[in-house]
Amino acid sequence: GAVTLNTTGATGHAEVDGGTTILDIAASTVGGNLSLTSGHATGITDSGTVTVGGNLIATNDVSNGDINMGSLAVDGTIALETSGSGGDVTLVNDVGLDFATSNIGGDLTGTATTGNISDSGTLTVTGATEITLGTTPTLTVTDVTSASVDGDTLIILDNSVFTGGIT
């Protein structure tokens, strides 16, 4: 079943290691940082809005395991880790996306509903990348060499489309 997490205050951190099971996070509010780990191919998912006042760290430590979180409200950075060419990540955040150091073995699909997308750490994606931004966003890659995307890249910016590689 789904796990509900609730903490208060900026120091109210939560850490969950689901072992080899699917980790489904129900509607939750974590005042501080949230760290999630799964070792299952279906991996980490959400079945309700997951609000995080600090940073989110999501790791799927099984080869080709996914992270699929479509109802995020993360105020801080997001760090992701998958392995294997099938280790895909899909994220939808209610504001911007600020990628901390992340290694994604498969594809990355990221949506910033109302905010900007940036990388405050090294973002490495082995597969294809699709980034969708809201209506008045900014895409900022502070150090071009820090964004390594080996697959195809598609960036959707207010109904305009950019395709190409980021190296």
Regions found by a protein language model. Give the residues of each.
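Extracellular lectin-like interaction modules
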Residues: 1-167
